[in-house]
């Protein structure tokens, strides 16, 4: 990043997803917890992969659907619906992907290359951000049920993003055949370990997919609940109305209180690698910040660690880039 850009956006900290969990008090005869309630701020407007654009919608899709590949904690591709790693042609214009066998959608229809082609072409047709994909993909070939070939317009440096995109979560062509040209916001048929039971903007209920092709869920389902503000979320966790809180949904003051409870072993805390950042932006069009030398001086003298301690109670880490490390790989 150039010096100029580093002043325009002074990085404060990376943003971690923390999972704050309570002990499950209710279990069934198989010793599996009853439905787990996961809470976060905001609403889900759509579960249609072609439209979903928020982190909350993506989390929901990750539970009910599968992509061709996923990224592991080191940022490397791991086959999901794909049977092996993708093969790139010598001219880097073809991505050749072999698919797993004996995978079925929630409606009982088979997953295959034709279904994946339908998924991609539907997104190209109506996807909210389809312009990003249409610039990359020239055409799609399906020589047989287990082979998918993606032809690119030109060599791409973002193949990982293409193959792991949650917006390309596989969907059933039979179920979506009447929605190739329009969104289906409140229903979903995919291949994931959970099935969508019911959908509203505030509450989404999932049940286990007993025919899931990989490891089966070890619970009786999930309730995704949306709350309006931090205080309500915090109170719901303290009163045991919810089991899991995605702590990026609450203010740092309350997150700090939860951290103290975790230190006292009253709740369980899990932390993932950061995938978002927060920053302070300087108004560079007004004096004296329109002076590059002033911005240089600020950048060299600013105490990022002090800001982290005072603003976020030390819960975040200083950063010098607008791109989280996990997304750079």
Locations of regions flagged by a protein language model:
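C-terminal motif of bacterial Sec signal peptides marking the signal peptidase cleavage site
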Residues: 24-25
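Short, well-ordered beta-strand elements
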Residues: 34-45, 94-97, 148-149, 192-195, ...
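N-terminal lobe/hinge region of extracytoplasmic solute-binding protein
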Residues: 39-88, 121, 189
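Aromatic- and charge-enriched surface segment that lines or borders ligand/interaction sites
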Residues: 84-127, 149, 236, 288
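Surface-exposed binding/hinge segments that line
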Residues: 86, 98, 132-176
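Gly/Pro-rich hinge or "lid" segments in bacterial periplasmic/extracellular proteins
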Residues: 164-217, 221, 231
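Extracellular/periplasmic solute-recognition and catalytic clefts
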Residues: 197-205, 223-286, 309
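Periplasmic-binding protein-like
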Residues: 285-327
